[in-house]
């Protein structure tokens, strides 16, 4: 137990330190490359002052997480297979597969935006094709490792065998969740702070359920979130871009699936799901009513902006909601 605690502490500290230091060097480099964000014209007018803020800053914490896990591997390599076991090591690699694959799609999207100096990168069709291919690879990996099960533990209903229905729901659910995290990256520090809280949930869940690899990746990611907040907290000196938010989406989603507990995303990803559902509801209602809206603006954090809330207040509010979701999830694990 002491060995695992030191492993997790090293991952968290390493993730923080490497990401924070990476930002010190990467932000000036992004400035020199003119990799600035183009702000949406339909967004709040006061966001125009953010125009030109460096984007693709997610590279900082991707580097931080990758380097941290690599250092931990070298430091603990004689004992790591014994502590984790080969199945957990393989499952950990599968988490990184979805995370880095999603991050690569986000990187392509960001790169097109900065090269063309507009806020539209990959088309929706291009992004969907890439995500379908990536998700197929991830689910094939789950199947190969014996982690793809049709039995899901639902709150209240208990263990339910969904049969063949599970596969399409899981497939498109993964794509939905990755994009939901991407949608949450709309304000300075918002997605970073919410993901930090979500990772605390996964760290605790992994510890309670015996999935050390989940706790290890969550600890490194939580540390990296804290390190990135040094640069991304309001007023942000850098944005994570789709590179970072898609990467986070991959981690948030994959961690639940490799534990064979996808229902935990309902708790640990409550803010992302809420955010995405408001967009879906708004678009559906807008089309059905030929121009009417339910919310003043979506994703929903912007609706609070329109009410006059400051970004820091909105960040704190959604981090609190994420914390409540984590608390509910941990309680659910303990009583289920």
List the predicted regions and their residue ranges.
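Membrane interface segments of multi-pass transport proteins and intramembrane proteases
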Residues: 115-123, 152-160
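Carboxylate/His-rich catalytic cores and anion/metal-binding grooves
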Residues: 126-140
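Juxtamembrane helix-loop transition segments at the membrane interface in multi-pass membrane proteins
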Residues: 34-35, 117-118, 243
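Hydrophobic transmembrane alpha-helix segments characteristic of membrane transport
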Residues: 108-116
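Juxtamembrane helix-capping/reentrant segments at transmembrane boundaries
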Residues: 40-54, 117-130, 301, 306
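Alpha-helical transmembrane segments and immediately membrane-proximal extracytoplasmic
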Residues: 37-54, 81, 87-91, 213
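Alpha-helical transmembrane segments
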Residues: 1-31, 61-108, 136-143, 152, ...
């Amino acid at each position: 137990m002491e060995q695992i605690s030191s492993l997790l502490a090293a991952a968290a500290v390493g993730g923080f330190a490497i990401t924070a230091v990476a930002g010190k060097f990467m932000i000036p480099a992004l400035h020199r490359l003119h990799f600035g964000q183009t702000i949406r014209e339909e967004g709040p007018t006061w966001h125009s002052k953010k125009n030109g803020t460096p984007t693709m800053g997610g590279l900082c914490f991707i580097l931080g997480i990758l380097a941290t896990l690599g250092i931990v591997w070298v430091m603990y390599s004689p004992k790591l297979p014994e502590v984790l076991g080969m199945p957990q090591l393989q499952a950990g690699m599968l988490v990184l597969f979805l995370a880095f694959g999603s991050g690569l799609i986000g990187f392509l999207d960001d790169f097109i935006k900065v090269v063309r100096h507009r806020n539209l990168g990959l088309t929706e069709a291009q992004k969907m094709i890439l995500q379908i291919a990536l998700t197929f690879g991830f689910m094939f990996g789950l199947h190969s490792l014996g982690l793809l099960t049709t039995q899901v533990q639902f709150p209240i209903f208990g263990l339910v065998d969904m049969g063949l229905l599970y596969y399409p729901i899981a497939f498109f659910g993964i794509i939905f969740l990755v994009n939901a995290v991407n949608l949450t990256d709309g304000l300075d520090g918002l997605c970073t702070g919410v993901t930090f809280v979500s990772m605390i949930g996964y760290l605790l869940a992994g510890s309670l359920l015996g999935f050390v690899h989940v706790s290890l990746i969550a600890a490194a990611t939580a540390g990296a979130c804290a390190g990135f907040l040094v640069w991304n907290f309001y007023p942000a000196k850098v944005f994570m871009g789709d590179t970072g938010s898609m990467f986070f989406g991959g981690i948030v989603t994959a961690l639940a699936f490799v534990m064979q507990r996808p229902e935990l995303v309902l708790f640990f990803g409550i803010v992302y799901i809420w955010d995405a559902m408001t967009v879906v509801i708004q678009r559906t209602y807008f089309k059905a009513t030929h121009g009417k809206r339910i919310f003043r603006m979506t994703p929903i954090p912007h609706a609070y902006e329109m009410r006059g809330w400051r970004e820091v207040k909105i960040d704190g509010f959604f981090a609190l909601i994420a914390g409540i979701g984590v608390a509910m999830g941990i309680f659910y694990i303990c009583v289920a």
